[in-house]
Amino acid sequence: MRRATQLFGICWLLCLLVACGESHFMTDASYRSRVEQDFQQKKALMPQGELFAILDDASLSTYEQEALEFLYAYMPLADITDYPGEFHLMNIRASQRAAEEMPWGKNIPEDLFRHFVLPVRVNNEQLDSARVVFYKELKDRVKSLSLYDAILEVNHWCHEKAVYMPSDARTIPPLAPVAFAYGRCGEESTLLVAALR
């Protein structure tokens, strides 16, 4: 009996250590609580189906869980229904990777990262995997630059990829101007924001 109690105690301590070692996406507990409430309200609007099933994945880190809840709390309803949770998780992991690997990534204030880097949507474009594709293409080009110079370099890269051409069509996704080598004003700005993220 004593051995079972010791084993239980050791397992409990290990679980506690693992849980304490995980980083939060939102370090401010009161803000985290507000996001959780907003997420629960959004979830209540959409009770049918498995729209939030990704959050049941036990392998998610605390950071990923909180980032998903943040995105779901504030994204348009159509982005919840039109794109699977795995898509949003892929983008969370890609943004976290960039923040960890770029020398200035850890210096981005948490609130700026949360509201201006993490979100996928820029405009009314269809969402795509631009964040992953652009990171692979841009990381070596900007990794040794200051944040200021990296921003300028990404802007130059966008100009290399696409030039302005007017059209009346809906805003195309960020990968499209690269493929077509042109885009409208909104498409070029969407390309730049997606590349900067």
What would you call each of these model-derived segments?
Residues D140-R197:
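Active-site neighborhood of thiol-dependent amide/isopeptide-bond enzymes
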Residues C20-I151:
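N-terminal accessory/pre-domain segments preceding catalytic cores
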Residues T5, Q126-L127, V163-P166:
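Short hydrophobic/aromatic-rich motifs at helix boundaries and adjacent loops
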Residues M1-G9:
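Bacterial N-terminal signal peptides that target proteins for export
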Residues F8-L17:
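Bacterial N-terminal signal peptides
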